[in-house]
Amino acid sequence: VISAVEMLRAIGDGTMPDFTGKRVAVIGGGNVAMDAARTALRLGSKVDLFYRRSLEELPARREELDHAVEEGVTLHLLCNPVRILGYENPDDPRDPKNGSVRAMEVIRMELGEPDERGRRRPVEAPGSEFIWETDCVIMALGTSPNPLIKNTTEGLAVNRWGGIIADEDTGETSLPGVYAGGDAVTGAATVILAMGAGKKAAQAIDQALQKTP
């Protein structure tokens, strides 16, 4: 079991284990999930991606999704893994496979009422559990801003989802001289958008410093 970010970082470092011939399950529906799925596929594995909502709610850019499917990633929509099952050899406690992933327990979902963001909430379909055999699980689930930032920064305005409120053009927050951008402001998005926000903030900071006596 590995996070998508850890996996992609390992690829860059050249330390990723051999995926050749393995069955890989990716959990998530964002752009990072697509990156992880396509990367694992190119490393020689069979990749299945599980997302608990429908195609309409899937947050990844459609271009990323289309490329993943074209390359051979299999989608399992309205499917939510709830438990990872490990391998254990009762006859040999020293078996090197002990503790490795052998399968996931997955439950099928149905769409219920919309949540606060307007997306219909996924609810479990009773009695729909099934076992999916896999050799590796890549977790590519959404993240939220570190609550430590808002909890330790007095006067910093945040929205109801915990994102920092910042000026769209300058990145300046409710605290003069404090700037923010990227996922901490917008929620899950792309690296390109985060880089753009950083550039705008840098320009605003430069202008502010030039005006400082």
Predicted feature locations:
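Rossmann-like NAD(P)H-binding beta-loop-alpha module
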Residues: M16-S45
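General small-molecule cofactor/ligand-binding pocket signal
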Residues: I2, T74-H76, E105, Y179
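A conserved FAD-binding loop/helix module that cradles the flavin
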Residues: A36, G181-T212
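FAD-site-proximal beta/loop scaffold in flavoenzymes
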Residues: I2-K22, D115-A188
